[in-house]
From Swiss-Prot:
GO terms for biological process: protein unfolding; proteolysis involved in protein catabolic process. InterPro entries: AAA+_ATPase (IPR003593), ATP-dep_Clp_protease_ClpX (IPR050052), ATPase_AAA_core (IPR003959), Clp_ATPase_C (IPR019489), HslU (IPR004491), P-loop_NTPase (IPR027417). Its main location: cytoplasm. Belongs to the ClpX chaperone family. HslU subfamily. It is found in: Cytoplasm. ATP binds at V21, G63, V64, G65, K66, T67, E68, D273, E338, R410. This is ATP-dependent protease ATPase subunit HslU. The gene is hslU. CDD domains: RecA-like_HslU. Coiled coil: none annotated. It comes from Thermosipho africanus (strain TCF52B). ATPase subunit of a proteasome-like degradation complex; this subunit has chaperone activity. The binding of ATP and its subsequent hydrolysis by HslU are essential for unfolding of protein substrates subsequently hydrolyzed by HslV. HslU recognizes the N-terminal part of its protein substrates and unfolds these before they are guided to HslV for hydrolysis. The keyword Metal-binding does not apply.
Amino acid sequence: MSDFDKLTPKQIVEELDKYIVGQSKAKKAVAIAIRNRIRRQKLSEEWKKEITPKNILMIGPTGVGKTEIARRLAQLSGSPFLKIEATRFTEVGYVGKNVDSMIRELVEIAVNMVKQQKMKEVEEKAKLNVEERILDALVPMKKKTQIPFANIFGMQMEKPQQTDDYSENLRKREELRRRLRSGELDNEEIEIEIETSNSPIGFIGLPEMEDIGMDLSNVIGNIFPKQKKRRKMKISEAKKVLLPIEEEKLIDMDETIQTALELAQNRGIIFIDEMDKIAAKTGSSGQDVSRQGVQRDLLPIVEGTTITTKYGPVKTDYILFIAAGAFHVSKPSDLIPELQGRFPIRVELEPLKEEDFVRILVEPENALTKQYQALLYTENVQLEFTDDGIKELARVSYKLNQKLENIGARRLYTVLEKVLEDVLFEAPEIEEKIIVDADYVTKKLKGIIEDEDLTSYIL
């Protein structure tokens, strides 16, 4: 059991609070959903089959934290996570992505996740193998050779000269190994052999092939043998190039794929954004009919079905689906009834207030102000935000959201980037300490805020 699996829903919310301000209802809903997954794993096989995830529908304007809540939750739980827009899909039979492709993408993410974990486990062993390959390039290993006549009678007589050569070779290698580990040889150039694909033609993936879980480029690539090429490079670069190659040799890909399939099926999270854009009102025609078609294609996946992928069949019964949308024009009730029923948990996220902007700039562990401070610290520039400076940034951002289109917390990015533009450009050729107070913010934004046309383009 991982450390995350021991967390209670309350503790999961506390973890999310470190990165996301407010939205306690949404945090509570996702924490319960994830905890129920952990509870399900402890049940007997008979009960496991009966209990499926309760999918969530998040309703709220852009920039209030819908995606971030789902993304952070996936990171905390170590779950494969895929964010997609519902609008990228088309009904089966039309040109465009079919809804099945989301499952294939999730599995691909899971395979890469497990592969990275396995590669990390064998990293030390792989580093030793890389070391040997580099030493082979510097001083080819000499083998002990036996006298042919002695071989006939099973005798192990060695030529004295060859024994001396072998010992000298070993001594040289050990000396170079010491220098290699200390980094003395990093700038030396060596020639190494690297395997490359020998496929004579480049292939573009066809949607038809993707739909049946086939990757044509992989099929063709497996037909043609891999070609070995010799490349010259510095030892420092060779270490980076050879490490993933040696790591891959040490991991069992069949086991990796099997683990990844289990992970995707039982712990996968798919975040479907812009769900409101595929909602269609009753009696509509044309484009709205196509939207309904996407909903009907989505239904069996959310209900639970088996999708064929290039790694094997994947059951979607236990994947957690989190859908989100602003629902300004349409309503959740405009979705087809069957799909509505598959998202039983509905959470409304609150629009951000001015005080929320203040908290967003200060409280999260990855707060924007802290990000800029860290960036400029690399140039020996100390950036300090005063309380009135933070409040002014929040006030301006909130006001712009009211005046222009409401893009939520994303407004802080544009405002802060504009305020710090000169500092970021001139660093490190400026004074070592920059204080961002209310006057500083006003001075940097004055001309833009006063000109409404300019505001709409720049902020």
